Amino acid sequence: NIGHFERLDGGNGDTLDVVEVIDWDTQGDTDWGPYGGAVNADGDLWTSGRGPGPLVFIDGDTLVYDRWETPPETSPYGITADANGHPWMGDWNGGLLHFDPTTETWDIIDTPNTSRGRGIMIDRNGFAWMASNNPCALVKADTATRTLIRDDIELPGCGTPVGISIDAEGFVWVPDQDASVAFKVH
């Protein structure tokens, strides 16, 4: 029932710091431990569990952590941080999740045309891009207004898109585990 985190030296792999988050699963129903992470511009780590949360913030300087339960009936999957350092997550149960650490409130953004949020990343223009299943599609949301733009961007021939990456030119890449391809979207 402990979330274990290690910060490694990028040059040689040595362990620099260790943080253990006690009571990782206070509800006794999390079937996944820490599941992904995102580092904000200040070097702090956001991470979450699946089935449900928690959401955890680890300060990159002090290594002190804060912990919040995710909203009921949600199951965070992918995670990223926006320009304000706030975490955004794909929701395995459908939709996107945003957490405001100042107000300690959640935004749940529904995706009515697709039901399984997966990997997520935010581009330099502040748009969140999320892979989604059931049916497979690409989702686009505006992080400034916290609103859905589209949840039905087609990926012709897709099977199970699982992740998102954005290259230096701003192209969105969507790897698909069943189709064994990566889609390039602008």
Model-derived features: where do they sit?
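Repeated scaffold domains used in trafficking and secretory/extracellular systems
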Residues: 30-39, 73-83, 114-124, 158-169
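Blade-level signature of beta-propeller repeat domains, shared across WD40, Kelch, NHL, RCC1
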Residues: 162-186
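Short loop/turn segments that connect beta-strands within beta-propeller blades
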Residues: 9-14, 58-63, 99-104, 142-146, ...
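Fold-core signature of tandem repeat domains
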Residues: 45, 79, 87, 96, ...
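Conserved beta-propeller blade signature
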Residues: 1, 6, 44-48, 86-90, ...
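Surface loop/turn motifs at the tips and blade-to-blade linkers of beta-strand repeat domains
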Residues: 19-30, 68-73, 108-114, 152-157
